[in-house]
């Protein structure tokens, strides 16, 4: 793997469409490095390397999935380097195409992996396996604070709350909200009581949406402004005039915004990582896997933008830079 650069050349296009016209002044990037990651590392690209027994990163199925992602990232990186992908929206489309290729058309969740979130739907992730390791991080987070959460089945619960926010064009953008119950003994007893009173199925349905331990994701009404910002970041990131430090900062910012926004119903974490890595690949950089214990979208959501940018290199399983 390497941090490779080469002299750029100008790519001219005779087409007159908006996208093609924007390529007229595009200066080609080095494209994917000839020196690829070791196969072992290729098979960890995109893996959710949870710090506990939830990690499935070494299963044959996961290794095949990750190597497929790696190869498709390099293909997208080559396309970017030649001016073939002119917006983040197009790059997200390539990531979505790859993700759908790992599913069978007609599978129950196929459409969710292909669909954007809308403002009339809730996006909630209960912090159960494989997310159990997140609980302690929320409780110990320096920006988390104590609140009382009201629930019609659990009553008033003491919870730790971390609210992720962003700043865009001088405005505060609320992103993800993490909640973790601290009344663990009461909660355990209450769940056992409700399972008997309501039945396991009814309780499961309630917990799927209103689990006291959960992430309430970025409201979809903010997605248009975030997507515009991602397009701006992408245009900056495909410049041939960037220093390596500037490039890595833009890649990290792109990854942070895409992962934190969670634009699609399913698969946004993988697509965000795909996009970040494809931009790096276009510049001749082979980003290594994330270190064991670092799940990139969770790291993004538990961080502010500047914090994530500052620690991005340290999250990767290499001292390449």
From Swiss-Prot:
UniProt cross-references to InterPro entries, sorted A to Z: Avirulence_B/C (IPR008798), Avirulence_B/C_sf (IPR036231), AvrB/C-like (IPR053495)
Pfam families found in the cross-reference section: AvrB_AvrC (PF05394)
Record localization: Secreted
Keyword set includes Lipid metabolism: no
Xref: SUPFAM superfamilies: Antivirulence factor (SSF103383)
Keyword list, A-Z: Secreted, Virulence
NCBIfam families for the chain: XopAH
Family to which this protein belongs: To avirulence C protein of the same strain.
Protein name: Avirulence protein B
Native source organism of the sequence: Pseudomonas savastanoi pv. glycinea (Pseudomonas syringae pv. glycinea)
Gene: avrB
